[in-house]
Amino acid sequence: MLILVTGGAASGKSEHAERLVCEKAQSRLYLATMQPFGKSAEARIARHRALRAGKGFATVERTLDLANLRLSRQYDGILLEDLGNLLANELFAPEGAGAGSAFDSIVAGVDNLQKYCETLVIVSNEIFADGVTYTPETMQYIRILGELHQKLTGKADAVYESVCGILLPVKEGKQP
């Protein structure tokens, strides 16, 4: 089963995604993709660690190249946190896939993760509604993230958007 949970900043998407994994999975893996650049990132990482404390998650930190990730065991559920950070790493890190391959690399990574679990829950960001003009690199990031959302929504069994702490169904069940 593949579930995509999207939402804006501080919308509750991570908490909802954790709850979904906990409801569906006895053995749980948290796959962290954020690089700890600066105090703000470190604070977010600490907050997420505190959120999942005591919930039985094993943790793997992997910032890119999920297609080549090899796990030592199967899990009932994997929580991938989050797609936006993973894309930024693949696009902008020197060892990342780069603009020409980031989309395919991430889709291959999702396919790989699904081999290791019954339920994969992916957290991502809704960043498409502010109407501000950005640099070409940022516009490329936004475009690829949107394309990833479309691809993963097509593959997903369920898609939810977290709005003001409320989890709203966008898609439930396979659709053509």
Walk through the language-model features, giving the residues of each.
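Residues at the starts of beta-strands that form the adenosine-phosphate
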Residues: Q26-L29, D76, T119, A158
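Conserved P-loop
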Residues: L2-L71
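Short, glycine/serine-rich, charged loops/turns that create anion-binding
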Residues: A10, Q35, G84, I127-F128
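Short secondary-structure boundary segments
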Residues: G7-G8, D82, E126, V163
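Residue-level signal for inorganic ion chemistry
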Residues: A17, H48, L79, N125, ...
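Helix-adjacent hinge/juxtasegments
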Residues: K55-A102
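Structural motif
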Residues: L4, L79, V121-V123
